[in-house]
Amino acid sequence: MSGRKETVLDLAKFVDKGVQVKLTGGRQVTGTLKGYDQLLNLVLDEAVEFVRDHDDPLKTTDQTRRLGLIVCRGTAVMLVSPTDGTEEIANPFVTAEAV
């Protein structure tokens, strides 16, 4: 076994492509992945943050904020997903009575 650390995720296929990143604390940003390291620190260009609802911080609004070039610290990254090729579906585990 070599002494070189490898990343948990292989993000090489997402470099120069759009990604969505969810961070601890509920922040959510999208942008073009420009780089990353073995600690999952991410560099995003043309980043846009989705502003959360003041009444319900778990929901995002249609309002966005342009951030430009940012670094997402790896310890704060909860989820990384491509923006292309994904679609939102209804939650099959939520019943009409629970809503």
UniProtKB/Swiss-Prot annotation:
The GO molecular function terms of this record are: RNA binding
Q: Which InterPro entries match?
A: Lsm7, Lsm7/SmG-like, LSM_dom_sf, Sm, Sm_dom_euk/arc
Summary of the tissues where the protein is detected: Expressed in roots, leaves, stems, flowers and siliques.
Q: Which Gene3D superfamilies match?
A: 2.30.30.100
Query: What would be one Gene Ontology cellular-component term for the protein?
Result: Lsm1-7-Pat1 complex
Q: Which UniProt keywords apply?
A: Cytoplasm, mRNA processing, mRNA splicing, Nucleus, Ribonucleoprotein, RNA-binding, Spliceosome
BP terms from Gene Ontology: deadenylation-dependent decapping of nuclear-transcribed mRNA; mRNA splicing, via spliceosome
Compartments annotated for it: namely: Cytoplasm; Nucleus
Q: Where is the Sm domain?
A: 6-86
Recorded family membership: Belongs to the snRNP Sm proteins family.
Q: Could you tell me what this protein does? A: Component of LSM protein complexes, which are involved in RNA processing. Component of the cytoplasmic LSM1-LSM7 complex which is involved in mRNA degradation by promoting decapping and leading to accurate 5'-3' mRNA decay. The cytoplasmic LSM1-LSM7 complex regulates developmental gene expression by the decapping of specific development-related transcripts. Component of the nuclear LSM2-LSM8 complex which is involved splicing nuclear mRNAs.
Assembly state and interactors?
Component of the heptameric LSM1-LSM7 complex that forms a seven-membered ring structure with a donut shape. The LSM subunits are arranged in the order LSM1, LSM2, LSM3, LSM6, LSM5, LSM7 and LSM4. Component of the heptameric LSM2-LSM8 complex that forms a seven-membered ring structure with a donut shape. The LSM subunits are arranged in the order LSM8, LSM2, LSM3, LSM6, LSM5, LSM7 and LSM4. LSM7 subunit interacts only with its two neighboring subunits, LSM5 and LSM4.
What PANTHER family does this protein's entry cite? Answer: SMALL NUCLEAR RIBONUCLEOPROTEIN, U6 SNRNA-ASSOCIATED SM-LIKE PROTEIN LSM7
Put simply, this protein is called: Sm-like protein LSM7
Q: Which gene encodes it?
A: LSM7
